Amino acid sequence: MIDTLERLRTDVDLWVASASEDGHAYLVPLSYHWDGAALLVATPRASRTARNLIRTGWARVALGPTRDVVIVEGPVDAIPIGADPELEDAHALAAGFDPRTLSEEYVYLRIRPHEIQAWREANELEGRSVMRGGAWLE
């Protein structure tokens, strides 16, 4: 669990998986901010990622390399630009860019972990669940 929290705190980018209504998979890298309780990403409001995640209200994301991966799954809330300046400032600092300065309309997507799995090698597969039902496991 400590390694997982460290990765959430220190990584900058993650992969976001989503699917269209007709089942076409879509995968995109996004920068994020971890506030200790949720992941915050920003993407163009008209993007497939935003449309898919807002429609389903659920996300599955991956952080880290394949041999030290963290998989996070949970509900998504859309936050319009300007709704929470403090959170938006934190995202800009962590992500290295500020979507509020861009001409294209962006939306923030808050992903609240419901389940987290983490593992490095096959010997860690059995104990890979570190969060279930929104509660950290020992």
Name each model-derived stretch.
Residues 3-4, 49, 87:
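Hydrophobic alpha-helical segments typical of transmembrane helices
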Residues 1-15:
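Short, basic/aromatic recognition patches
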Residues 1-3, 27-28, 46, 96:
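A generic local structural motif
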Residues 6-9, 54-55, 92:
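Alpha-helix boundary recognition
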Residues 11-45, 51-53, 59-63, 71-73:
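Short beta-strand segments
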